[in-house]
Amino acid sequence: PLGPSFQFGRGESVFVRYRVLGFTRSREARVHLECTLDAMDPRGIRLVETQRKTVDTELSPEDKDWAPVLLHEFVIPPLADPGRYRIAITAEDKLSGQRAQAEVFFQVRGPVVEPSDTLVARNFRFLKGEDGPVVAGPPVFQRGEMLWARFEITGYKIGENNRIEVEYGLSVLGPTGKEIYAEPVAAAERSTPFYPHHYLPGILSLNLEKAQPGEYTLVVKIRDLVGNQQYESRHRFQVR
C-alpha cells in the first residue's frame, strides 16, 4: 500500500489489488463472483470504462481457506486535473445475491488550469526554447533566434461522445502594425476521448531569422468548432 502523502503523476499507471471474503460456496463447492471497479476524478467523472472481473470456479477440499485476489490496472489520463480521486469497487456474489462495496482515494499532482465557461487561453508565456525556460521580464529576442510560446486552452464545448474540435493559429504584426506573417491553422485537436479533459496545451514557434529590430505583436487565434466560439489574444515582443 502507498503512504498517505503519495501522489500519482498524470499518465501513470495505477494498480489496485483486493481480496474478497465471506462469499458463498454451493453444494458442488462452486464460487461465482462478479466484481467491478470505477475510477473517478474530483468532479466524479470516470477516467476509464468500468472494469469487470469474474470469479467462477469449483474448489477442492484443500481449498477451504482460499479467497480470490483480484488485480486491476488503469492509466491516469495525461491531461487529468490535480486533486483527490476515488476508486469504487463492488463485489457481487451471484450465488447468494449479496453485494459488498469499498472505496479508496488517491491524490494526483499536476498544474492547475482555471476553468472557464467560454473559450480562452490561460497562462500564456514566451519561452527561450521548446521546453523553456520562460522568458523573465519583457520578452526580448535576438534576430535569428527561435521564439516559442505556450498556453493552455479551456472553455471549449464538448460534443457528443466527448467530441473535441479545437484549432489555433497565429499571425505577426510588424512595428507599423501591419500583418507580416500568418499561419491560420498551426495545430488542431480533433478527438473523442473517453475522458473529457477540460483543457488542451497549446504551443507555437516562430523563426526570427529575417526579423528586423523593432517591436512586434504575436496574435493568437483559437477556434472551437463544436461550440462555435473564437478567441484572440495579443502579446508584444521585441527583436534586437
Task: Identify the meaning behind each predicted range.
Residues 1-240:
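Intrinsically disordered, low-complexity terminal regions enriched in Ser/Thr/Pro/Gly
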